[in-house]
Amino acid sequence: MVITVAKELPPAYEPEHIARALKLADVIAARAPAHDRDASFPFENFADLSREGLLALTVPAALGGIGAGARDTARVLGIIGKADPSTALVLSMHYIQHLVMARSTRWPGRLSRKLAKETVEGVALINALRVEPELGSPARGGLPATIARRTATGWRLSGTKIYSTGAPILKWYAVWAKTDEAETRVGLFLVPAGLPGTRIEETWDHLGLRASGSHTVVFDDVVFPLDSEIDVRKPDDWKVPDFTQSTVHAIFVAAIYDGVARAARDWLVTFLQERVPANLGAPLASLPRVQEVVGGIEARLAINARLIESFASDFDDGFQLTAIESNIIKLTVTNNAVKAVEDALQLTSNHGLSRTNPLERHYRDVLCGRVHTPQDDSTRVSAGRLALGV
């Protein structure tokens, strides 16, 4: 591992789960190029993570999990994100759901306990399915087309969800849908994967995060129990963001893409130390211009490390940040990560864009940080409106 000014910030102690993540990182990283090339799903990574107890990282200790907070979870996601961000993204969505379950007064206790038990005992991942072909992301407003119809024997769910990260491995879906009641409600329903009428369409063929399995999930009159409502409310009641959801989503997404930039930085440093052009007679690392650019990368990653560390610690300490503050952290860290990898490409020219080297994969992956909700324009507009009082 390359040690630099912008090294990852370790906690004051090294918990066992951090050591386990570090142990798995090399194995996961070795698999990443093939899964990227083939756009195949890394099932074996999740078997390994389960065996090390890391799928239960954010499950409360009282329910048999590790009970990690945002700080340690961000550290694990940074480690796994550096190895394979597709795996880390699926993992982060699962972690977010369990943190929300543990802190929410709306999640039915019986359901959260059931999912916690399954996660402790095996590979039982969950993710929220929210994005739709027409609606796009619900973060920008609007009601979903996916509809849950109440019957005497259960809910009947119909609709289509796109960009369903982890679709090949998910055991549970938290589906964002509206009801057919006289007064429409909207919210999350817990739906087991694989029920009759459910199908996965393998539509994910992306520039980056190609192994994330973010396919389309279609529900065609899928029947599930009436007591599977997670949190369903009147549409206007959703105007205030969930603090836990918005905060940890920002932290975890930021940590993953910072990890990608660190993987790019490590490869770059080794390349510059070892590359000796014939007309120079010395490593590229000896050039002041190269040192300046690498120093700029170090500065961005050092800022990222401090932001993620302090923000996650604030969350763990009970300090409640606003959604705008959370979103600004995500914007800053992901854009720093993108710029760091762009600068690495600038220094390496054709070598950096060659499929024989990992830098082009890191670049494709890090660009995906900009498309995660909230997008940069929404964050800047919200911050600007608040500052201007409009």
Language-model-derived ranges and their functions:
Residues E8, A12-P15, F252, G281, ...:
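Register-specific recognition of a single heptad position within extended alpha-helical repeats
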Residues A19, G259, G295, A299-A302, ...:
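Generic structural signal for well-ordered, non-transmembrane alpha-helical segments
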Residues P33-D36, A302-T332, L345-L353:
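C-terminal helix-coil-helix/basic helical segment that borders enzyme active sites and/or dimer interfaces
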Residues F43-R51, L57-T160, T165:
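Glycine-rich flavin
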Residues T160-I200:
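A short core secondary-structure module
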Residues I162-A167, V248-F252, G369-H372:
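Glycine-rich phosphate/pyrophosphate-binding beta-alpha loops
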Residues H206-R300:
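Glycine-rich beta->alpha junctions and the first turn(s) of the following alpha-helix
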Residues N350-V390:
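Glycine-rich phosphate/cofactor-binding loops in nucleotide/flavin-utilizing enzymes
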